[in-house]
Regions:
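Intrinsically disordered, low-complexity regulatory segments
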Residues: 1-171, 488
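Basic, low-complexity terminal or inter-domain segments flanking catalytic cores
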Residues: 2-3, 82, 119, 174, ...
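Structured, non-catalytic alpha/beta "coupling" segments that mediate domain-domain communication
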Residues: 27-55, 197-241, 354, 412-463, ...
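C-terminal or mid-to-C-terminal helical accessory/interaction module adjacent to the motor/catalytic core
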Residues: 138-223, 280
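Metal- or metallocofactor-binding catalytic centers and their adjacent structured scaffolds
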Residues: 245-288, 296
Length: 712
């Protein structure tokens, strides 16, 4: 029996259809007489051990126990809800003669099935199916092109190394820096992540740049020249670098200089002429089809869709067999798929009026740069499938995204965009002016995007310039002084933050790393970036104001004391570079992890000596002067001193604040806590606020019934 293990039930059902259909047995599908069986996971069925799974002492967070470095990495079932499916797969693996790995064609999809087979001590031969599309023809083609799963060991190892690195950073550094933060009065445990924290820091630093920004007013002199009594050439003055009134950025900041120049030109009884001409013919190759991140960024700009919404919609389109695998980090296509183009384009006719004419005019003889086997890894760019799309059956977001994907695919079958760029230099009264213009010679693929394009609305640029020669005269027509201001950096939106994660080389602290990291595909993956941004919002590190991301007080607090190793993306970007080395077999998982231990230890050591400033609204303990924090005890909320165990003072909680007024009764049992009236299952009673004291007293007419010698 051949056993297929899919990443999720929907994928399993499509594989079963590709095999000819079968009988659904609930947790698997049996094909024919049982020669093939298709079962599935629900994402990861396994997860790494938590620290206290390795040793119960880690249930309490103590700096002296850190760092936690497993000598042997272990896994466990993700939870009781997956046990039945796990048991089904275990039984089927035991019966199977061979296994087909049907995880998603990416790093995590590879690990997801491999780790399960390893956990089950599988020794059966394993093949790999790569499904980039779920339409019937694509599934059957993939079934006829199974590969040896050993070819993907590097991909699995890189995913495993990523998992271990995330665990080491998250478990150790979250615990380490939570201790000094808690001692300073911050009630929440910190959550530090290898990718989350530098992503949060990008937003904090951008906000700090905006707050520090001071606008600079500067001036430009715009002159319109008349050529042959009809045509107007619009130009800008180019001040000499030695002229007064320029700042360090060579912006003119003295208005009187601009006004003086304008008067000089207006009053000059001298001719102006063309002193220099530059003409350049330029080509723009066809835009590439979409990777997931490119689609998320563009959909964010065009429709204000957040990255998570785009991923969810693309997953739906994939499962409806209308587009290919959504979590792709690739924007190229395999050369053998060029032969499918006529069938795909034929399927795009009749879908939408905007696509009809584009599809009909597509030139199948054009072979764009998108078709390149050398750029392909496990998956390719997102494109439409052969399946006919009923656009009316999709919601508005799915429609818009489908049309974006279809248009980008069709652009591959249109000519290059060709234009002529012209720059003129005009001399008048020993002053220089420049004018630029652009003439489209062949619109090509850009004609598909003309409605959305605003590139020709460039400030100060002429849509076209007259056919003029060097030395020809022009006459002054009109002039003005333009007042402009420098603009602050723009706040991140979810889409532009995702783009920054993808292009992380632009945001590193060590600029010498910039070129090296250009080849790294950013921090996070296509599948996780949207989730990371979402989780930062849910955990109150970031919040959305209108469509922009702004940091919260918690983020600013963390940035004050976390080391650069954690907050700058340099370290984690270099780790991504190493994960690529593991994938290609140039480095082992052990070598990678061993190289990270010194970084983890260094950060833990820093946390041990760290002093954190208390929060703005901190309440000071009246007894010792340290900070009170709100805690949960067996009888509800109370406030305890961060000086514990030296100071054991506690206070009852009153509407979220410590009630420090001494009007409560001291507990006669422990003499440190205070008695509070609480409502239990059988009515009111009095309990001690000290979490270590479990003494209770009956309620009598709203007061505690105490022993005769109790102190009040």
């Amino acid at each position: 029996m051949r056993l297929f293990i899919a990443e999720k039930p929907s994928l399993g059902r499509e594989i079963a259809k590709g095999l000819g259909g079968g009988t659904n047995k609930g947790k698997y599908i049996e094909i024919g007489n049982g020669q093939d069986i298709v079962t599935w996971e629900f994402g990861h069925l396994l997860e790494n051990y938590a620290p206290d799974d390795y040793d119960e002492k880690y249930k309490t967070n103590r700096l002296e126990d850190l760092p936690i470095i497993p000598s042997e990495w272990k896994m466990k079932l993700r939870g009781p809800d997956v046990k039945e499916q796990f048991d089904t797969i275990r039984r089927l693996v035991e019966k199977a003669d061979s296994i087909v790995h049907a995880g998603d064609p990416d790093r995590e999809g590879q690990l997801l099935v491999d780790e399960l087979l390893e956990y089950l001590h599988n020794t059966k031969p394993v093949q790999r199916i790569l499904l980039n599309a779920l339409d019937e023809k694509s599934v059957k083609e993939a079934l006829n092109d199974l590969r040896d799963n050993k070819d993907f060991v590097g991909l699995m190892n890189s995913a495993r190394a990523r998992s271990y690195a995330d665990w080491l950073v998250g478990m150790n550094l979250s615990r380490a820096f939570s201790v000094p933060a808690r001692n300073a009065g911050y009630p929440k445990a910190l959550r530090i992540g290898r990718v989350k924290t530098p992503t949060m820091a990008l937003v904090v630093r951008r906000e700090e740049e905006i707050q520090k920004f001071k606008a600079v007013t500067y001036y430009q002199v715009q002159i319109d020249w008349r050529y042959q009594d009809a045509k107007i050439i619009r130009s800008l003055w180019q001040p000499d670098e030695n002229i007064g009134g320029l700042d360090l950025e060579e912006r003119l900041i003295d208005r009187s200089v601009a006004e003086g120049l304008l008067s000089k030109i207006q009053e000059a009884n001298v001719s102006a002429s063309i002193s220099k001409i530059e003409k350049t013919t330029k080509k723009e190759l066809q835009r590439l089809p979409y990777s997931l991140s490119a689609l998320q960024v563009e959909a964010g700009k065009r429709f204000s869709y957040d990255p998570k919404t785009v991923l969810q919609c693309m997953q739906q389109l994939y499962e409806k067999k209308l587009t290919t695998y959504p979590r792709s980090d690739c924007d190229y296509l395999p050369e053998n798929q060029f032969n499918d183009a006529s069938e795909i384009i034929r399927g795009l006719t009749g879908v939408h009026e905007d696509l009809d004419m584009i599809a009909q005019n597509a030139d199948l003889s054009i072979h764009s740069r998108a078709w390149n086997d050398k750029k392909i890894s496990a998956h390719h760019a997102i494109i439409p499938t052969r399946e006919k799309c009923d656009l009316g059956a999709l919601d508005e977001k799915e429609q818009n995204l489908y049309l974006m994907v279809a248009r980008a695919y069709l652009a591959q079958f249109y000519p290059e965009h060709i234009y002529q760029s012209t720059k003129l230099w005009i001399e008048c009264a020993n002053e220089n002016f420049t004018a630029t213009g652009k003439v489209i010679l062949q619109d090509g693929w850009r004609s598909l995007y003309r409605k959305e394009s605003s590139e020709d609305d460039t400030d100060g640029e002429n849509s076209s310039l007259p056919n003029i020669s060097k030395g020809e005269p022009v006459a002054y027509q009109a002039g003005s002084v333009l007042e402009k201001q420098t603009k602050p950096p723009t706040r991140f939106t979810p889409a532009t933050l995702l783009q920054a994660m993808k292009e992380i080389h632009k945001h590193v602290k060590d600029k010498s790393l910039k070129n090296r990291l250009k080849s790294v595909s950013g921090i996070g993956t296509e599948a996780t970036r949207a989730t990371i941004i979402d989780s930062l919002i849910e955990a109150d590190f970031l919040r959305l104001e209108k469509k922009f991301l702004v940091p919260t007080e918690q983020s600013y607090m963390m940035m004050k004391f976390l080391p650069d190793t954690i907050t700058w993306p340099d370290t984690t970007a270099l780790w991504e570079d190493e994960l690529e080395d593991i994938k290609e077999g140039r480095k082992t998982v052990k070598e990678f992890i061993d190289g990270k231990l010194s970084t983890i230890q260094s950060c833990v050591n820093e946390a041990k000596w760290l002093k954190v400033d208390p929060p703005k609204n901190a309440v000071v303990c009246p007894d010792c002067g340290k900070v009170l924090v709100r805690r949960t005890g067996k009888n509800g909320y109370f406030w305890g001193c961060t000086g514990y165990p030296d100071c054991k003072k506690t206070y009852p909680d009153k509407k979220g604040k410590p009630d420090t007024e001494d009007h409560t009764v001291t507990c006669p049992a422990c003499r440190t806590g205070r008695l509070r009236r609480l409502k239990g299952k059988y009515g009111y009673f009095w309990g001690c606020s000290d979490p270590d004291c479990r003494k209770n007293f009956r309620d009598k007419n709203g007061k505690p019934e105490l022993p005769a010698m109790a102190n009040h």
